[in-house]
């Protein structure tokens, strides 16, 4: 039986203070690199090592924030930013393509102290969607902004826009071409688009990255980052 590699990652990467049972101020962080179904058999040992190294970097980055007394929101943002900067995950620089060959990114974050949240959707020129989602939460009267409106808000906040091709990667592009071939073949057999999309193998159905953290003050925060897939 084939084991989904990212399912292993999602369940195994968890960092907890060694002093959690003794200290008065325990803290913790958990991350996942995607809830997709990329089969482990598709990775060489070297590739799997690279994935695990980046996941370790992400969780350790968030852990360091908490260990130094930082807030859970900062830990979540820091951990997810690491994953967004990597081409290995379906977020930020590793985002899969839309059907027309571009990239549209989404992210959201929530503060457990007051249940405030911020989100962005369908942004094309934002290098770190999770950071923009946090700006929406902190500096906007809205909970969610999308598309051009989100990017106009980003410029108002001093966020530099980037070219959409920053998110291009060869493996994702090859996956797009294969997926489009399968969709076209399915539609040629009289299947409408949604039915054809559902017929895609699990290897084309990828998930988000995310993190949840508890800081020394007992505050919980969570965030996630992903993209619009094959729209």
Task: Give residue ranges: language-model regions.
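Bacterial N-terminal signal peptides
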Residues: 7-17
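Sec/Tat signal peptide C-region and signal peptidase I cleavage site
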Residues: 18-22
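Alpha/propeptide regions of enzymes that mature by internal proteolysis
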Residues: 23-230
